């Protein structure tokens, strides 16, 4: 008989509504001796069977639901999940001409703790939960069955694994080692991705729609692209006809790739058109403000400021500071394109921070457009936490 967990009376409601997380305080008792990541049956207080879940004894999220149906969690299970995810994305893959996209968006694709990004024929896995680690071989075997010619590389070098009792790890799981540069295409733009050494799994695929939408604000404009990384927004700004784009980032290797990406797309990167500036964005914004330097468009896409609730207040101050500075260096009629990828910061809070930043900058500002993560990053209706990326276009009057 498999191990099982029984829920505290009244705590069945979220599982019945198909939320995939079961917290430690919601568990009344554990039967058997489930090991790290092992699949357990989930029962209500009344003994009614509810779900199959992965057990994680060291995490506050004590179990993550694989399925609300009575089925084995094996290779065939993951084959079906991956096939369903690929089918869900077929339209956007064709529409946007994608050779790089998110194949599996963790809980939102019924695979909690599992992220899989595809770059050409390289599939990059992040396994962030005990259950995902326990099922690693089944997941890899399922990928091989669905995509026979695939190469699979693991980028589980993420600190959140420690909360699950896991060590950070990377390496080839199947096939070849990724080369230094894998070139993908989206919306007709070519982008070089460093799978092994880049941020996350190599690139920020979730901002694809925002990059495309940014193009309508940049024609014949002076653009400052903050936290530019490998130049994603800057590439779209050049494609959109920007007069000049300054890409600012603290990482010289990222800026070198940004320049390479511009050359890859055969954009004009003379100093009159494109600049790749190694700088601390916070200091740079203050320097521009103090010098009286102004821009038509500022793009503000910072890294995640809040990894935990304890960091949220500090993150709010950081977001407010950079957006206030951005408003201060915008010309009248200028546009701020600003984003937050911190899931702990909801849309209403982010909007309030931007509003407060406008007040502190002494500028009259209108919200004119809202942005969210790209369509290959879906949000399951039972899992609102899957909505994490938000952004605004703000017009300075």
UniProtKB/Swiss-Prot annotation:
UniProt keyword terms in alphabetical order: Cytoplasm, Methyltransferase, RNA-binding, rRNA processing, S-adenosyl-L-methionine, Transferase
Family: Belongs to the methyltransferase superfamily. RlmI family.
Top-rank taxon, per record: Bacteria
Matches recorded under Gene3D superfamilies: PUA domain (2.30.130.10), RNA methyltransferase domain (HRMD) like (3.30.750.80), Vaccinia Virus protein VP39 (3.40.50.150)
Entry's Gene Ontology cellular component terms: cytoplasm
Keyword RNA-binding set for record: yes
InterPro entries for the chain: PUA (IPR002478), PUA-like_sf (IPR015947), PUA_sf (IPR036974), RLMI (IPR023542), RlmI-like_PUA (IPR041532), SAM-dep_methyl-trfase (IPR019614), SAM-dependent_MTases_sf (IPR029063)
Cellular compartment(s): Cytoplasm
PUA domain mapped to chain residues: 2-80
Enzyme Commission code: 2.1.1.191
HAMAP family for the chain: 23SrRNA_methyltr_I
UniProt-listed PROSITE patterns: PUA (PS50890)
Protein's recorded name: Ribosomal RNA large subunit methyltransferase I
Underlying gene: rlmI
GO molecular function: RNA binding; rRNA (cytosine) methyltransferase activity
Catalytic activity: cytidine(1962) in 23S rRNA + S-adenosyl-L-methionine = 5-methylcytidine(1962) in 23S rRNA + S-adenosyl-L-homocysteine + H(+)
Role: Specifically methylates the cytosine at position 1962 (m5C1962) of 23S rRNA.
SMART domains in the record: PUA (SM00359)
């Amino acid at each position: 008989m498999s191990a099982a967990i029984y829920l505290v009376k009244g705590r069945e409601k979220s599982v019945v509504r198909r939320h995939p997380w079961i917290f430690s305080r919601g568990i009344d008792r554990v039967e058997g001796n489930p090991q790290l990541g092992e699949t357990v049956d989930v029962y209500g207080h009344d003994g009614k069977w509810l779900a199959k879940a992965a057990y994680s004894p060291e995490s506050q999220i004590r179990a993550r639901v694989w399925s609300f149906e009575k089925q084995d969690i094996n290779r065939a299970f993951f084959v079906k999940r991956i096939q369903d995810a690929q089918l869900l994305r077929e339209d956007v893959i064709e529409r946007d001409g994608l050779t790089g996209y998110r194949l599996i968006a963790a809980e939102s694709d019924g695979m909690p703790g599992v992220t899989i990004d595809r770059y050409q024929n390289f599939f990059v896995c992040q396994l962030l939960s005990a259950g995902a680690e326990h099922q690693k071989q089944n997941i890899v075997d399922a990928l091989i069955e669905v995509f026979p010619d695939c190469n699979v590389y693991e980028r589980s070098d993420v600190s959140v694994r420690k909360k699950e009792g896991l060590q950070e790890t990377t390496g080839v799981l199947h096939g070849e080692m990724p080369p230094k540069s894998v070139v993908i295409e989206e919306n007709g733009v070519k982008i070089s991705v460093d799978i092994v050494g880049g941020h996350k799994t190599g690139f920020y695929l979730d901002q694809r729609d925002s990059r495309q939408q940014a193009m309508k604000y940049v024609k014949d404009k002076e653009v400052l692209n903050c936290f530019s990384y490998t130049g994603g927004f800057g590439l779209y700004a050049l494609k959109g006809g920007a007069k000049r784009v300054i890409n600012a980032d603290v990482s010289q290797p990222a800026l070198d790739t940004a320049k390479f990406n511009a050359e890859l797309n055969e954009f004009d990167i003379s100093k009159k058109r494109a600049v790749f500036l190694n700088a601390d964005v916070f200091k740079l914004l203050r320097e521009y403000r103090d010098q009286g330097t102004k821009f038509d468009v500022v793009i503000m896409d910072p890294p995640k400021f809040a990894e935990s609730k304890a960091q949220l207040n500090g993150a709010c101050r950081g977001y407010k500071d950079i957006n206030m500075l951005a408003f201060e260096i915008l010309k009248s009629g200028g546009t701020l394109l600003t984003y937050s990828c911190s899931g702990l910061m909801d849309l209403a809070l982010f909007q309030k921070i931007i509003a407060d930043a406008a007040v502190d900058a002494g500028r009259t500002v209108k919200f004119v457009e809202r942005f969210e993560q790209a369509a290959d990053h879906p949000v399951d209706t039972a899992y609102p936490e899957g909505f994490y990326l938000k952004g605004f276009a703000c017009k300075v009057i």
